[in-house]
């Protein structure tokens, strides 16, 4: 389907459930895609939207055959569940120059084939369930600007290794719960909050390295089989002793 000149918006639920659409070519004048516009358009494979600035809630949710999404530097808003349930989506490219500040809640929830994500440099928050059950997502570049990772943001993701940015301040509850391929994690020195169950269920996680004392540490942040590397006599060390976690010292 080609959307020609003269259109600036695709209306709410405009093509919801349309199973005949296969390729979407939106004219550069189209600035906004409203809620549920292409919800459950199960035959759509490709989209081209060079001028879009706003993608509203559930706009492409349930497009189970969609394979890729390239979002330009004009992108300002991408609301929750925008691409949730797009099970064949393998690649998402958000322009490095995009002004978007947050990956909203559940944006890519259960995109189980997603294996490549490019984030804008200015992202400060990854929302709740943003990459929930993205089981093929083995690597992820965390922008230096990132301050918060939300609850269950990467629940059961396929991450094999992560490098958390130095200025990260909060890891939410169950943020990396059941990331079963993770083997090592270093917590940055500016982190203030580690939510409960943050790295619990990461069965291969051998070492969680924490060289400082966060202000708040939740319960069961790792499995008992994981060693927590910290400074002897620190508050982190006491937390480990009180909760029965194995320790290694710097």
Model-derived features: positions:
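Structural signature of tandem-repeat unit edges
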Residues: 1-9, 19-32, 42-54, 64-77, ...
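A structural signal for leucine-rich repeat
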Residues: 61, 96, 109, 132, ...
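Contiguous hydrophobic segments
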Residues: 82-85, 243-247
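Intrinsically disordered, low-complexity segments
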Residues: 106, 152, 197, 220, ...
